[in-house]
Amino acid sequence: MVKTITISDDVYNELLRIKGNKSFSEVLRELLKERKGNKEVLKRIFGILSEEEYQEVKKRLKELEGEFEKWEQSLTQM
């Protein structure tokens, strides 16, 4: 059965960018599986870091995210 959904232009463009030769259904299915997998990983590692360690990791991840976004923007401007 086919269903129609409404998504914003920016979401459509992002899906279009990552889909390659896959169908939108395949891409969405992969993203949903990935999300579920991440949830399972989080359940397994919950509680292994102290609050201080968690805050440090969180800070570093935010820094890395910013660096990655800058790198990604530099690639799209080429």
Curated annotation (Swiss-Prot):
Name the record gives this protein: Putative antitoxin PF1222
Keyword Transcription regulation: no
Keyword list, A-Z: Toxin-antitoxin system
Keyword Transcription belongs to the record: no
Role description: Possibly the antitoxin component of a type II toxin-antitoxin (TA) system.
InterPro entries, per database record: Put_antitoxin
One protein family per Pfam: VAPB_antitox
Family: Belongs to the UPF0330 family.
Organism the protein comes from: Pyrococcus furiosus (strain ATCC 43587 / DSM 3638 / JCM 8422 / Vc1)
